[in-house]
UniProtKB/Swiss-Prot annotation:
Cofactor list: heme b
InterPro entries: Cyt-c552/DMSO_Rdtase_haem-bd (IPR019020), DMSO_Rdtase_II_haem_b-bd_su (IPR017838)
Role summary: May transfer electrons to the iron-sulfur centers of ClrB.
Protein name: Chlorate reductase subunit gamma
Any one GO molecular function term: heme binding
Applied relevance: Has potential use in bioremediation of waste sites contaminated with chlorate, such as pulp and paper industry wastewater.
Any one annotated GO CC term: periplasmic space
Keywords: Electron transport, Heme, Iron, Metal-binding, Periplasm, Signal, Transport
Gene3D superfamilies reported in the protein's UniProt record: 2.60.40.1190
Record-listed heme b binding positions: 74, 138
Signal peptide: 1-27
Keyword RNA-binding: no
Primary localization class, coarse: periplasm
Gene that this sequence comes from: clrC
Length: 239
């Protein structure tokens, strides 16, 4: 009984936060029209898309995505995120989805040697049910999201979340990443098979569209956990 009450309360809180954040996003971003929130996926028969500097990325459409500071999920971790935009691309090849992200970051934060040091990072997010009605703010107790999280220390995490503070690592050997440090910042590719087991995340096989969200962390700016730059609304992968 207590568990059910807690779940309902979390859902209500999540909906309230979503309403507030969506309104703020619309005002701050000038409400990017839904028709413009499209990431077009380039489908190729083969080839190597795993590297951020692979030739295929010169052919894939590039979309500029605006980011905003995420709603503070924890009152002790607050601030203004540094990253304001990133360039997103996507390729479907050899039964995998490859997502390439590129953004400006003046300093490379790749290690944490002390408690006041934090890593650069980036992530993409999908609603497991494939529905835009899912909250883009880490989901809710009923609607789970799947996050692919790249960290600048070389780790790549496959996560499931049911709301703020609920991110849970889910073992998988199929999520991969590659990164390149450029003179301007980072270029990162995250990839995973289109089809995975239900308990491992979002199934992308056979879909014509899929909601997707983005996030970036600037370690130099003390960003970690919920302090990050994010998309406040779902964008759409269009296969």
């Amino acid at each position: 009984m207590k568990t059910n009450i807690l779940v309902k309360r979390m859902a209500v809180i999540g909906l309230a936060v979503a309403a507030a954040c969506t309104g703020a996003a619309a005002a701050a971003q000038g409400a990017v029209p839904q028709a413009q929130r499209i990431i077009r996926v380039l489908s190729v028969a083969g080839g190597d898309a795993a590297s951020p500097q692979a030739a295929v990325w010169k052919k894939a459409p590039t979309t500029q995505v605006t980011l905003l500071t995420a709603f503070p999920g924890h009152i002790s971790i607050v601030g203004t995120a540094a990253t304001q935009k990133l360039a997103a691309q996507a390729v479907r090849a050899s039964g995998r989805l490859f997502v390439r992200l590129a953004w400006s970051d003046r300093t490379a934060n790749t290690v944490m040697k002390d408690t006041d040091q934090f890593l650069d990072g980036a992530a993409v997010e999908f609603p497991v049910n494939g529905k835009v009605a899912t909250l883009p703010f880490m989901g809710d107790p009923v609607n789970v999201v799947n996050v692919w999280h790249w960290r600048a220390d070389g780790r790549t995490l496959n996560l499931l979340a049911k709301g703020f503070g609920t991110s849970t690592p889910v073992p998988t050997e199929d999520l991969r990443s590659a990164s390149v440090r450029t003179g301007d910042g980072w270029e990162v590719v995250l990839s995973r098979p289109l089809r995975v087991k239900a308990e491992e995340g979002a199934n992308l096989q056979g879909r014509r569209t899929m909601p997707i969200g983005f996030a970036a962390w600037d370690g130099e700016n003390q960003e970690r956990d919920g302090l990050k730059a994010v998309t406040m609304e779902w964008w759409q992968l269009r296969f």
